[in-house]
C-alpha cells in the first residue's frame, strides 16, 4: 500500500514538473523537443552546430565565426570612413555586391515560410496556414514554465505602471541626435499601419491585415467593399474633393466609409481614407492626402499613355506603381536615414534574382511590438508660427486645411523628433499606448530580451548596466526584474543605450532590419515575373517607380515643391542633446498629460 502511494506521488510530481525546454537549453537556433516529462532533445539540423545543446560549431561555422565582425563593428565601419564610401557608392559592381550582402544577410534571419504563432510554439499547419495570426520569430514561453520568462527571474513580472513610471515616461523631451524630423515620424506611422492591424476583437496575437506586407491597404482599403466606396470609377481614380483649389480626401458622408471620429467632429471635417484610424492626427491625414494626389496623378499619366485602357486597369496599374514608389522611398530615403550609413542603399530587385529568396512575407508580432516608436513624438506640434498640444492636434483635420499641405511639410521638415532609445522619452500623452504594448507582450508570452538577442545573432547582455549604459535606471530595472535574463523585450528596446549619436540601440536595429528588408523585398512586384516595365504600364510607369523619392513625392503633389527630407535641414540643430535619460530627475507628478489616446489608437 505504501509503495503504491509513493508511486502515485512520484507520478504526480513528474506530471507537474516544469517543461524541460523552459530553460531554453538549445542554442544557436537549435530546437528543443521534450522527451517524456523531464528530458529534452535538441534538434541541431542545419544550424552549423552539433552536440547535446547545439553549442559545438562545425568546421565551416568556426571559420565564419572567426571572420565575421560583430554588429557594432559593422555599424561603425558603415557610419565612418565617408571618403571611402563615396568611392564605393560610385563603383556600380562594388555597390551592388555590398547591397546584395546587406539584403541577404538580413532577410535570411527571417523564417520563410513562417514557423510559430502565439498559440503554437511548435511547427504546425495551423501556424503556417492561418493568416489571421501574426507569426512569431520565437515561440511563446510555455504555459507550464515556472516563471514568465521560462526559468529566470521572478514568479511575477513587475507592474506595468511601475515600469512606465521608472524608466519609460518622459521627464523632459530628449531630441534625436540623428536629426530625425516629424516628416519621418508621421511617415513611419502612416506606412506601417497598412500591415500592423491588430484585431481588436480577437486580441494582439491576431491581425486583420491578411496581405502581411506592403499592399497600400491604408490608401485603398482593407476590403474590396471599402475600396469600391473610395473609388471614383472613372479613369482609375480615387474619390476626392477640392478645397481652396487643392485636392483632399472625400468625406465619410459622401463615401459611406467607416472611419473613427469622435461624435463632436463636424461632417465636413470627417475625411475618408483607406485606414479607419487615420483621422486621429493631421500628420497621418497629411500623408493620406499626398498619396491620394499621387494616385490620381499617376492615373493621368497612364491615361495619356494608354487611352485604350479602362478604369479598372488604370486603377490596378496605378496601385502597383505606388507600391513600387513606396518600397523605393522606404529603402533609399527612410531606411537610409535610420541606418546613418555612408554606404548608399539601393532598391533594385534584380540584385536578388540569382539568390535564394522567397517572395512571400508574414508579419511577426515582435516586429509590430518593436515598431512602437512613441518617443519620436514631441510634446507639442508647431505648424508655421502656431503651436498645438496633443489635445488640440487630435482628430483635427481642420488644421490641415487651414494651414495647407505646404506649411505642414515645411514645418514638419524643421521640427525635430524624439530619440527612441535611452529611456524616459515616452510622452505622457501616449502612456496608455505604451502600457498596452507591455501588457500585450505579456499576453503573447514573449521570451526575454536576451533570447531575442541570441535569435538575431547578438551576444546576450550580462547586466542591466550593460543594457542601459548607466547606473541609475539599471538599478531600478534590477529591482523590478531581478535578472537580466528575465528582462522584457519592449521596455528593453526603449531603455537600451543608443548607439553613438543614433536614434536606436543595437537590438532595435539588428531585430528590425531583417523584418523590414524581408517584407519589402519579398513583395510580389520585386519578383522576376513582376519586375519589368509592362507590369507598370510601360517605360513611363517603370520610370516613376525607379525615380521615386520623398522629395519627388512632395514636389509632384504639394504646391510650391517645398524642400523636404527625413532629417532636419540643419544637422547642427541636433548636436546638443542629452546622451542619457538618467540625468533627468524631475518627478512625474510635476508633469500633467494633455490627453490619453483611447480605443483603436492603442496600436498607434
From Swiss-Prot:
Keywords: Dioxygenase, Disulfide bond, Endoplasmic reticulum, Fatty acid biosynthesis, Fatty acid metabolism, Glycoprotein, Heme, Iron, Lipid biosynthesis, Lipid metabolism, Membrane, Metal-binding, Microsome, Nucleus, Oxidoreductase, Peroxidase, Prostaglandin biosynthesis, Prostaglandin metabolism, S-nitrosylation, Signal. Pfam families: An_peroxidase (PF03098), EGF (PF00008). One of its GO terms (biological process) is prostaglandin biosynthetic process. Its cofactor is heme b. It is found in: Microsome membrane; Endoplasmic reticulum membrane; Nucleus inner membrane; Nucleus outer membrane. It catalyses: (5Z,8Z,11Z,14Z)-eicosatetraenoate + AH2 + 2 O2 = prostaglandin H2 + A + H2O; (5Z,8Z,11Z,14Z)-eicosatetraenoate + 2 O2 = prostaglandin G2; prostaglandin G2 + AH2 = prostaglandin H2 + A + H2O; (5Z,8Z,11Z,14Z,17Z)-eicosapentaenoate + 2 O2 = prostaglandin G3. Pathway: Lipid metabolism; prostaglandin biosynthesis. Its main location: membrane. Glycans are attached at residues 53, 130, 396, 580. It is a peripheral membrane protein. Its EC number is 1.14.99.1. Belongs to the prostaglandin G/H synthase family. Dual cyclooxygenase and peroxidase in the biosynthesis pathway of prostanoids, a class of C20 oxylipins mainly derived from arachidonate ((5Z,8Z,11Z,14Z)-eicosatetraenoate, AA, C20:4(n-6)), with a particular role in the inflammatory response. The cyclooxygenase activity oxygenates AA to the hydroperoxy endoperoxide prostaglandin G2 (PGG2), and the peroxidase activity reduces PGG2 to the hydroxy endoperoxide prostaglandin H2 (PGH2), the precursor of all 2-series prostaglandins and thromboxanes. This is Prostaglandin G/H synthase 2. It comes from Cavia porcellus. The gene is PTGS2.
Amino acid at each position: 500500500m505504501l509503495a503504491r502511494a509513493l508511486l502515485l506521488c512520484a507520478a504526480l510530481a513528474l506530471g507537474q514538473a516544469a517543461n524541460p525546454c523552459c530553460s531554453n537549453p538549445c542554442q544557436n537556433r537549435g530546437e528543443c523537443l521534450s522527451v517524456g516529462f523531464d528530458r529534452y532533445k535538441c534538434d541541431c539540423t542545419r544550424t552549423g552546430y552539433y552536440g547535446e545543446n547545439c553549442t559545438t560549431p562545425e568546421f565551416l561555422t568556426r571559420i565564419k565565426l572567426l571572420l565575421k565582425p560583430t554588429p557594432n563593428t559593422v555599424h561603425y565601419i558603415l557610419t565612418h570612413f565617408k571618403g571611402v564610401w563615396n568611392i564605393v557608392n560610385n563603383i556600380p559592381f562594388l555597390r551592388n555586391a555590398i547591397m546584395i550582402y546587406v539584403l541577404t544577410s538580413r532577410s535570411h534571419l527571417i523564417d520563410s515560410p513562417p514557423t510559430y504563432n502565439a498559440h503554437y510554439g511548435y511547427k504546425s499547419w495551423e501556424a503556417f496556414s492561418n493568416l489571421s495570426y501574426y507569426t512569431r520569430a520565437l515561440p511563446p514561453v510555455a504555459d507550464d514554465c515556472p516563471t514568465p520568462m521560462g526559468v529566470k527571474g521572478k514568479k511575477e513580472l513587475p507592474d506595468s505602471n511601475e515600469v512606465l513610471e521608472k524608466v519609460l515616461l518622459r521627464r523632459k523631451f530628449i531630441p534625436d541626435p540623428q536629426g530625425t524630423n516629424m516628416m519621418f515620424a508621421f511617415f513611419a506611422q502612416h506606412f506601417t499601419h497598412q500591415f500592423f492591424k491588430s484585431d481588436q476583437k480577437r486580441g494582439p496575437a491576431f491581425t486583420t491585415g491578411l496581405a502581411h506586407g506592403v499592399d497600400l491597404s491604408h490608401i485603398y482599403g482593407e476590403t474590396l467593399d471599402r475600396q469600391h466606396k473610395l473609388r471614383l470609377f472613372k479613369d482609375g481614380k480615387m474619390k476626392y474633393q477640392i478645397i481652396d483649389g487643392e485636392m483632399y480626401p472625400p468625406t465619410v458622408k459622401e463615401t459611406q466609409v467607416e472611419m473613427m471620429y469622435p461624435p463632436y467632429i463636424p461632417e465636413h471635417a470627417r475625411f475618408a481614407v483607406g485606414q479607419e484610424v487615420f483621422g486621429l492626427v493631421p500628420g497621418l491625414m497629411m500623408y493620406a492626402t499626398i498619396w491620394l494626389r499621387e494616385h490620381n496623378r499617376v492615373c493621368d499619366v497612364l491615361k495619356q499613355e494608354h487611352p485604350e485602357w479602362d478604369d479598372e486597369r488604370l486603377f490596378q496599374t496605378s496601385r502597383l506603381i505606388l507600391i513600387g514608389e513606396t518600397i523605393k522611398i522606404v529603402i533609399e530615403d527612410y531606411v537610409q536615414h535610420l541606418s546613418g550609413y555612408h554606404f548608399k542603399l539601393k532598391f533594385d530587385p534584380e540584385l536578388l534574382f540569382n539568390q535564394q529568396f522567397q517572395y512571400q512575407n508574414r508579419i511577426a508580432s515582435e516586429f509590430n511590438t518593436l515598431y512602437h516608436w512613441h518617443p519620436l513624438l514631441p510634446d507639442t506640434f508647431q505648424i508655421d508660427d502656431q503651436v498645438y498640444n496633443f489635445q488640440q492636434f487630435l482628430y483635427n483635420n481642420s488644421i490641415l486645411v487651414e494651414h495647407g499641405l505646404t506649411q505642414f511639410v515645411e514645418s514638419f521638415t524643421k521640427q525635430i523628433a524624439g530619440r527612441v532609445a535611452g529611456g524616459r522619452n515616452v510622452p505622457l500623452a501616449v502612456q496608455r499606448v505604451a502600457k498596452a504594448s507591455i501588457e500585450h507582450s505579456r499576453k503573447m508570452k514573449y521570451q526575454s530580451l536576451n533570447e531575442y538577442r541570441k535569435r538575431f545573432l547578438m551576444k546576450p547582455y550580462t547586466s542591466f548596466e550593460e543594457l542601459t549604459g548607466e547606473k541609475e535606471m539599471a538599478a531600478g530595472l534590477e529591482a523590478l526584474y531581478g535578472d537580466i535574463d528575465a528582462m522584457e523585450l519592449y521596455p528593453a528596446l526603449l531603455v537600451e543605450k543608443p548607439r553613438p549619436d543614433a536614434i536606436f540601440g543595437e537590438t532595435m536595429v539588428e531585430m528590425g532590419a531583417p523584418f523590414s528588408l524581408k517584407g519589402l523585398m519579398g513583395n510580389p512586384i520585386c519578383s522576376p515575373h513582376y519586375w519589368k516595365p509592362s507590369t507598370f504600364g510601360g517605360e513611363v510607369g517603370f520610370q516613376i517607380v525607379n525615380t521615386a523619392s520623398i522629395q519627388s513625392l512632395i514636389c509632384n503633389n504639394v504646391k510650391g515643391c517645398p524642400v523636404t527630407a527625413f532629417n532636419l535641414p540643419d544637422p547642427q540643430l541636433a548636436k546638443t542633446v542629452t546622451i542619457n535619460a538618467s540625468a533627468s530627475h524631475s518627478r512625474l507628478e510635476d508633469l500633467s498629460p494633455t490627453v490619453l489616446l483611447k480605443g483603436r489608437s492603442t496600436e498607434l
